């Protein structure tokens, strides 16, 4: 029996031209989780990250002495590309500056994508789901007792929804709940794969509660 730990990256730079970059708070969040792992003596046999900068920057705050693999299957869906498919070149700019508008549009746009209403998207919903599935297979090494993956909210919510046999629309409900640097754990064997815990953030208990964010 082995453990797959999925970590959502730390807070990125909302409203900035380069979203794929941790904010100052994000670096603090990642350092907190790294310290927690060290205190708990978590020493995975294998670490995997997506190829986006926010995944690498989050991992840099961990002192993990093991092999690190990169796998693009753990990358987030391309929200800007989905917006282009939804709105064309005239994307409303408040989506990038107003959080309420951003998340409302995120839910609507991704739901349309799931239901094949965005034919011009570079990646189809089916292709996204398939690459996440392949990333899970790549990560679940039966020779490892513990595998840590640094990824994003979309892939994590897709894995959780699939594991629970939830309708695809539930992915967005899960996606919008996932906290920065949260930990979701899965147990796997040659014949089974199940959810053990979801969206855990003990590093933000007590005096660190003010550091908790969802985006």
Pin down the residues of each PLM region.
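Generic beta-sheet signal
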Residues: 4, 145-151
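Short, well-ordered beta-to-alpha junction loops that form the rim of enzyme active sites
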Residues: 51-52, 73, 149-154, 198
């Amino acid at each position: 029996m082995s453990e797959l730990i999925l970590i959502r990256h730390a807070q990125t730079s909302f409203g900035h031209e380069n979203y794929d970059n941790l904010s100052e708070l994000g670096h603090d969040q990642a350092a907190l989780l790294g310290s927690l792992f060290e205190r708990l003596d978590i020493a995975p046999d294998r670490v995997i990250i997506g190829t986006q900068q926010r995944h690498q920057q989050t991992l840099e705050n961990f002192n993990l002495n093991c092999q690190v693999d990169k796998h693009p299957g753990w990358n987030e869906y391309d929200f800007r590309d989905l917006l282009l498919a939804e709105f064309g070149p005239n994307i409303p700019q408040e989506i990038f500056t107003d959080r309420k508008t951003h998340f409302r549009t995120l839910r609507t746009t991704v739901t349309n994508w799931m239901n094949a209403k965005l034919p011009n998207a570079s990646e189809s919903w089916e292709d996204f789901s398939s690459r996440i599935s392949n990333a899970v297979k790549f990560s679940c090494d039966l020779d490892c007792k513990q595998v840590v993956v640094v990824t994003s909210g979309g892939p994590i919510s897709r894995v959780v929804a699939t594991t629970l046999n939830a309708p695809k629309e539930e992915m967005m409900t899960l996606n919008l709940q996932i906290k920065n640097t949260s930990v979701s754990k899965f147990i796997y064997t040659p014949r089974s794969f199940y959810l053990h815990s979801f969206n855990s953030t003990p590093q933000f208990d007590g005096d660190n509660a003010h550091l908790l964010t969802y985006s």
